[in-house]
Amino acid sequence: MTTGGPTPDRPRAGKQRLDAQLVAAGRVASRSRAADLIKRGLVTLDGRRLKASDRIDSRDFPRLVIDDHPWVSRAALKLVEGLRQCPDFSPRDQVCLDVGASTGGFSQVLLDAGARRVIALDVGHGQLHPRLSGDQRVLSLEGLNARDLDPTLLAREGVTRLVSDVSFISVTKALDPALRALAAGAQALILIKPQFEVGRDGLQKDGIARDPQAALDLVAAWLQDHHAGWRILWTGDSPIVGGDGNREFLMHLERT
C-alpha cells in the first residue's frame, strides 16, 4: 500500500470521483498519478478494480488498497512470488521466453532478476511497455500466436527458461510448441488460470471455476500424455486473484 506522497488530508465529504478523492486524501500526489495507478488496475476496493469515474466516500477508504509497485503491470507480482518460491528457476544469465507478454510485467521481472535476454511473445500489437520495447535485451514478437511459434527460433536464441501468462486459451494449446522445442535442462514457470482449462461445464454462471484444483490435474495429465520429458517440481497459489475473481496457480517444470 502506498505510504509516501503529500501530507495526508481527509477525503471529501460525500461520494466523489475516485481520482479526486485519492488526491484530496493525500494518498497520491496528483490527479495524473492517480489516473496512472487506476489505469494499471492498481486501485481496488474489496478486491475489485476501480475506474477513475467510480465514486467513493470516506467510509470506503479503510477497504481501499493501492498496490503501488515498480512494475509495468500488476501481473508482475505473480512472477515475483514464483521466483521466491522456486529459487532453482533463477533466470540470471539465461535467455528467457515470455509467452503472453502483454505489457511486459513478467519480462521486466526476468530482466530485474538478471536475465541476459528476453523474447516477449504476444498475439496482440503495441502492448509492450516502452520501458521494455526500448530495452536492447528484449526481442519483441508482436502479433504472433504462441501455437505458431517457430521451434528453431528457441534453439537459435538458446532459450533455457520459459514463463507464461496467457488468457482465453489453455496452456495445453499455447505452450505445446515451446515445450516440445526446449532442450533437456530447460525450466518453465507458468501461470494456470482454471477458467481457461476446465471448459464451460466446469464454470459457474459467474465464470468462476467450480473446482480450481481440477485445472492442475488436467495440465498434469496433459504433460504426462504429451510431454513426458517434463516433470512438475512445484505448484502453488498465485499471490493475486485474477481480475474476474478466479483463483490462479503457478507451476514450476523442468525438462529432463
Model-derived features with residue positions:
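A short glycine-rich, Lys/Arg-flanked "PGG" loop and its adjoining helix->strand segment in the class I
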Residues: 172-189
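Short, glycine-/aromatic-enriched active-site segment of Class I SAM-dependent methyltransferases
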Residues: 194-210
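Conserved class I S-adenosyl-L-methionine
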Residues: 91-102
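Conserved S-adenosyl-L-methionine
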Residues: 111-117
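S-adenosyl-L-methionine
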Residues: 119-173
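Core SAM-dependent methyltransferase catalytic element
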Residues: 240-256
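A basic, amphipathic helix-loop patch mediating RNA/tRNA/ribosome contacts
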Residues: 2-61, 95
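Residues at the N-terminus of the alpha-helix immediately C-terminal to the conserved SAM/SAH-binding loop
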Residues: 102-107, 124
